[in-house]
Amino acid sequence: MAAAPSGKTWIDVQKKTFTGWANNYLKERILKIEDLATSLEDGVLLINLLEIISSKKILKYNKAPKIRMQKIENNNMAVNFIKSEGLKLVGIGAEDIVDSQLKLILGLIWTLILRYQIQMSESDNSPKAALLEWVRKQVAPYKVVVNNFTDSWCDGRVLSALTDSLKPGVREMSTLTGDAVQDIDRSMDIALEEYEIPKIMDANDMNSLPDELSVITYVSYFRDYALNKEKRDADALAALEKKRRETSDASKVEVYGPGVEGGFVNKSADFHIKAVNYYGEPLANGGEGFTVSVVGADGVEVPCKLVDNKNGIYDASYTATVPQDYTVVVQLDDVHCKDSPYNVKIDGSDAQHSNAYGPGLEGGKVGVPAAFKIQGRNKDGETVTQGGDDFTVKVQSPEGPVDAQIKDNGDGSYDVEYKPTKGGDHTVEVFLRGEPLAQGPTEVKILNSDSQNSYCDGPGFEKAQAKRPTEFTIHSVGADNKPCAAGGDPFQVSISGPHPVNVGITDNDDGTYTVAYTPEQPGDYEIQVTLNDEAIKDIPKSIHIKPAADPEKSYAEGPGLDGGECFQPSKFKIHAVDPDGVHRTDGGDGFVVTIEGPAPVDPVMVDNGDGTYDVEFEPKEAGDYVINLTLDGDNVNGFPKTVTVKPAPSAEHSYAEGEGLVKVFDNAPAEFTIFAVDTKGVARTDGGDPFEVAINGPDGLVVDAKVTDNNDGTYGVVYDAPVEGNYNVNVTLRGNPIKNMPIDVKCIEGANGEDSSFGSFTFTVAAKNKKGEVKTYGGDKFEVSITGPAEEITLDAIDNQDGTYTAAYSLVGNGRFSTGVKLNGKHIEGSPFKQVLGNPGKKNPEVKSFTTTRTAN
């Protein structure tokens, strides 16, 4: 036996061993004795130890004693409990425990060990012998000698043999090192690992100072393990059977469903875990430790939801967003379930192989939904047959983004629709999970117009003539039947017929398009107008192209081709005739008129639209002029033609003379002569000038004048003035009065030689002032009035400026007359005066009595 460590006694060994024994129980309440002598002082740890080893409760003890009395009370309760268990305590009381009497405390603990660990009383020696005999039988095969519980254990061989005997192979004797302490310590470690025997004493203590009670206490654990092994095995077998019956076996668990077979992106991949026990029986309860993980080939883990249905079925689901291979791991308590891990292919469309197509990528119209289709294809180029892919569509118009709607058809195809609001070039691009399709963006022409609503009008749409330019207008109309206000639509126009026709289209940028063409040959033609290969309204349109006018058959006639005069419009008419001699009935011919002469002339030609053309020109100088008429560059029959232009009569230089412009009588024709003089002041010697005579008489009377062209530059004028009075005579040339016009002419009653009487009278009045004195100066108002049926009368009132006033008058006719004379508004003495002229019985019944008045001053 090795020497005991310096200063260490059996008390120290027992203290450590018994402390370890007690702490092995106290640990279940997370309690611990630090020093056996002092830790039991308050009675709390001792009471807890007693409750644990006896499986009984000690009630109403002080759990936090502060004073000695409370500690003694607790320990009294502990001592009394030990006695109540039938144990006899000698020489120890509560005060001894409070006062830390170690030897007495060791005796107390040994009493507890005997009862609850070794199950024997202190006076009974047979259990000790029985324990020794049990050890001998256990280690007999190992050829080791054990005679006691002291020095037989010093070299560690007995302990090593005992350790291996409970489970052969765990402590091979051949592995002993010969170092007793090391071998003992290793055996204690194995006993702890394999049999859960607490290491309540040190290897040094067993080697150098083997305290019998300590060794017995420690070795008793081995016998307990051996005696309880059968029960433990039975319990373990029962527990195993229970586990096999009531819990799942990872190797038998069934995992099934599309989520472990294959799936599609963005669609829930579901599968189920069926709890199955060791015997292959399905379990109907939940709560087991299944775990699921899903990791893609790119190393990214996909969240997986696991739901315990509490009926033995667990529902798992995950949604992959990237098409690739995934590893699905299903474990039960960190053990792979049957067939786990699973290699699952999640299919989905690939941006490099998917494509978009349809009319919405080829063109569209404002206000009309434009549709196209997306077809998903996987990385192998195979058509995808399920929906759920994350396709997005971006539509950009000249004015900004346009909303696009995507419908997932569930079969790998997607219907896309967008509704343009403005015409012009649009860009449409399709993305898959943010990546553009390989086909890239598509440029789409969006039209303002709708082919079914757009239409044409204009002359060139109804009729045309060979070799004549013509045109018509395309009116673009939207799908809403409203006229378009913007251009840019690709209308196509063609005209087919016997001969090719070149067509030009001008976009007016206002929703209209001008179509111009010049057919070279006549015949029946067809107009085609299309928009994106669709015919517009009323198309095709048949049109007959008439023959062009023939310069050999066409002709001109009119006075302007015979001659003219300066400053006067000369006119003639062109008649368009086709090669068959048929007069054309519409316009548009290429006639051109040129005139050359002494002065420039700009002829004006008007297309009457009926096959005739009116030409008018006004020469400014006299002389010979050459008129040329061409049709498409060829001279018309009879041209060129020379015409003579005479000097024009001048209103400024022309004049009129004659008695009819001086004095006329109501009973005789009045005559005068117009003398035509040209602009150079030369008297004209021929006629034809458009002189006009206008004569207006009293009271709005209009008198007709007869003008006779003497064809020698003079024009005779005769008119009758039917009543007396003033007449206004005006002679004009082309609206302009001739020299000294207009002129006033007085018409008087003409005398009848058989019936008329004549009287001439004169008298003088001498004026006096208020004093009756004759005045010697004039200035008074002298008024003379004659009333009667005069056929002709002249009357003058004269202030002689010497205080006398003279009245002079003459009368023609028959009848009674009255003459009134006033000075300053008052009749002179005897006024009015009565007189008779001729024979009143012969008075002209058509002459009525009237008053004539004259005033001086």
UniProtKB/Swiss-Prot annotation:
One GO molecular-function entry: actin filament binding
Extent of the Filamin repeats: 245-346, 347-446, 447-545, 546-645, 646-747, 763-837
Keyword entries, A-Z: Actin-binding, Repeat
Pfam families according to UniProt: CH, Filamin
Domain (Calponin-homology (CH)) ranges: 12-117, 125-227
Region (Disordered): 832-857
InterPro entries the UniProt entry points to: Actinin_actin-bd_CS, CH_dom, CH_dom_sf, Filamin, Filamin/ABP280_repeat-like, Filamin/ABP280_rpt, Ig-like_fold, Ig_E-set
Keyword Repeat listed: yes
Post-translational modification Blocked amino end (Met), affected residues: M1
Disulfide-linked positions: none
Record note on domains: The rod domain contains six 100-residue motifs that appear to have a cross-beta conformation.
PANTHER family, alphabetized: FILAMIN-A, JITTERBUG, ISOFORM N
Subunit structure: Homodimer.
Role this protein plays: F-actin cross-linking protein.
The protein's name in its UniProt record: Gelation factor
